[in-house]
Structures are given as C-alpha cells and as structure tokens.
C-alpha cells in the first residue's frame, strides 16, 4: 500500500493498532537527489497521512525509522543525539523534517513517538539490486563473480549496524524513549575499501573494482555514539561487523545455490 493513499485510514480503523512502527519510505539518497519532489511526497506527505490515521485510530505511539543522513557532514565525530543536523541530501532533509512533525504531533496532538536515527543497516534479505546497501550489492556481485563499483576513493566511512541489532532497538522503543530521537550505531566507522577487503577474505574471490565519482548527496564520514540509546532504550549493538558480513554473505550464497 502507498502510505500517501487515503485508504490507509480505513486500514488503521479496521485493525486499531496500539503502536505503529513506521519504516515505509523512499530510502534512496540517489533517487532523492534526482527527484526531490517524489522524495518529499513519500517521506513527508506519506508520514503526515500515517500520523493523521494514527490519531483517528487511537494509536498510542509511533516508532519512526529516521536516519543518520540527517546529520550530513558533521564538524566532529562521533555523531551524538545532540550533533547539529545539516543534511546533504533531500532524503536527509525529509527525515529531519519528519522528526519535527513527530515533535509537533506529540506536543500539540498527544501522539507519542520515538525516532531511531539509523547508521548503515545491513544483513540478510537486504536488496542487492538497488542503489543503496553496499554490503548486499557487493556480496551478490562476489557470488556472481562479477566486478564491483566503488564510488569516491573508497575511504569514505559509515557506521554499519546489523539488522538484528536494529530490530532489537525497535522493540526497545515500544515502551521506552518517549519523545526522543536516538542515533543507532556501533560506534565504529568502516571504509568502503575495508568492506571490500573483508568480503574478499570471506569469499576467496578478489572482485575487479571500477571506481566512480562521489554520488550527489553522499556524506564523507559517519560514526555514531549511541550512549543515549543505551541509557534510555537499554539498547546496545552486539553483532561484530565480521560476524554480520559472514552471515549476510552466507545468506546470499544460499539464495544462489537455491536459484
């Protein structure tokens, strides 16, 4: 279902959810730079439809998937919940705007929320055919014995957080973190080149590399200090990057064998 569709309200009315976990979004930075109007339509107008439908259905709380992209290129690392938000892409802008709407709906309309500002989430079942999710894209390419593309110089860093850890953060937010916006990461920054080298070691295949320019909207570095999430949500990332990479690679390997 398109979250912008007016029929969303009828669904909420039928099922009467107590809590809404809102992950539906236009999530590609690249698409947001090519079509900012579409990005805003889904991520802002769609959110407002979800919030209005929630109010009418008597929803108690919304747990919202925000993004570390709201911070852009910070002056200092690691990024904390109090780091100034200066997004470098329309995607990051719409996620920041969404947080402001959530605050409004809490203070003026009585709808509670918790927003989770994710690092780079990865893991099994991630789409390897899109423009986002370098680990899934690399893993699938390695298994097909194809080359990979590395944008920029490959030394740009991200805080890669495993999907199971992120799922736990969402469960924690069901009853905790009222009105809070929390960065969700491991506290470790890893370059794209390092991800490539780790997958070479896991797969035993050195994929040919093609270099490309920086993509519009991409930030240079990201590293998140989730101390506030530890205190308020009682959450901590527990999966080592190497373990998550291995599990993700094995998942795509199983798909390749089954296919």
Identify what each model region corresponds to.
Residues 86, 128, 159-162:
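Residues at the N-terminus of a long alpha-helix
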Residues 140-259:
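C-terminal substrate-binding subdomain of Rossmann-fold SDR/epimerase-dehydratase oxidoreductases
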Residues 36, 128-129:
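Active-site loop immediately N-terminal to the catalytic Tyr-X3-Lys motif
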Residues 31-32, 73-75, 125, 160, ...:
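Short glycine-/acidic-enriched loop or helix-start segments at secondary-structure transitions
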Residues 97, 101, 105, 138, ...:
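Hydrophobic alpha-helix immediately C-terminal to the catalytic Tyr-X-X-X-Lys motif of short-chain
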Residues 1-121:
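N-terminal Rossmann-like NAD(P)+-binding domain of SDR-like oxidoreductases, especially those catalyzing
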């Amino acid at each position: 279902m398109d979250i912008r569709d007016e029929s969303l309200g009828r669904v909420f009315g039928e099922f009467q959810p107590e809590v809404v976990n809102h992950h539906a979004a236009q999530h590609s930075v690249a698409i947001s730079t090519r079509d900012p109007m579409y990005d805003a339509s889904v991520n802002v107008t769609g959110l407002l439809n979800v919030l209005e439908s929630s109010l009418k259905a008597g929803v108690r709380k919304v747990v919202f998937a925000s993004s570390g992209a709201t911070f852009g290129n910070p002056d200092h690392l690691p990024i904390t919940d109090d780091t100034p938000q200066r997004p470098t892409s329309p995607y990051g802008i719409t996620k920041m705007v969404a947080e402001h709407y959530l605050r409004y709906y809490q203070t003026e309309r009585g709808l509670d929320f918790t927003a989770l500002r994710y690092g780079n989430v990865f893991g099994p079942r991630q789409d390897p055919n899109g423009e986002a999710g370098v680990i899934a894209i690399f893993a699938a390419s390695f298994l097909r014995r194809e080359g990979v593309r590395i944008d920029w110089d490959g030394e740009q860093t991200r805080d890669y957080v495993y999907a199971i850890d992120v799922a736990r953060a969402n469960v924690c937010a069901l009853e905790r973190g009222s009105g809070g916006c929390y960065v969700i990461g491991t506290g470790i920054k890893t370059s794209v080149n390092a991800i490539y080298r780790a997958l070479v070691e896991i797969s035993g295949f050195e994929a040919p590399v093609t270099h490309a320019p920086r993509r519009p909207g991409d930030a240079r570095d990201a590293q998140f200090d989730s101390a506030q999430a530890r205190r308020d949500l009682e959450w901590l990332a527990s999966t080592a990057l190497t373990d998550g990479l291995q599990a993700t690679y094995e998942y795509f390997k199983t798909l390749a064998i089954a296919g």
